[in-house]
């Protein structure tokens, strides 16, 4: 049996980043169970300050995960990206970057869509037959 993977991304605003990437990848933000969270608080395992309201839902403040929607619906083994709150800011260059595969879509069209949602265009590049936009 193969192993599954969770990629963890440190973020100042994990819930907003999870929303953005879920929309970009056409994945879903993993639901959090407000009743379970309230239960953990009432039993003394968690405190109110460890929670927040995001888009009208009670969630854990420190993180949000995204998964392919079909994995959530089918309860498939977890492949997920977890965005977790990091108190410190970034201090050095990112050691990981994400290549968003376009599956035949026009890269300029996708660039415009991502910019409209808050991404920043940095530069375009080409190597042999491959070309891309670098964005942040």
Regions found by a protein language model. Give the residues of each.
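Helix N-cap motif at beta-to-alpha junctions
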Residues: 13-14, 103-107
């Amino acid at each position: 049996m193969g192993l599954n993977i969770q990629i963890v991304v440190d973020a100042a605003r994990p819930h907003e980043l999870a929303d953005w990437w879920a929309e970009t990848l056409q994945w879903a933000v993993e639901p959090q169970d407000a009743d379970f969270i309230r239960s953990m608080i009432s039993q003394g395992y968690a405190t109110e300050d460890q929670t927040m309201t995001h888009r009208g839902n009670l969630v854990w403040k420190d993180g949000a995960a995204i998964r392919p929607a079909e994995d959530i619906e089918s309860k498939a083994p977890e492949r997920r990206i977890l965005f977790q709150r990091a108190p410190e800011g970034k201090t050095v260059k990112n050691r990981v970057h994400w290549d968003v595969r376009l599956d035949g879509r026009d890269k300029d069209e996708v660039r415009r869509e991502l910019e409209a949602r808050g991404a920043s265009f940095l530069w375009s590049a080409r190597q042999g037959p491959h070309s891309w936009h670098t964005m942040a």
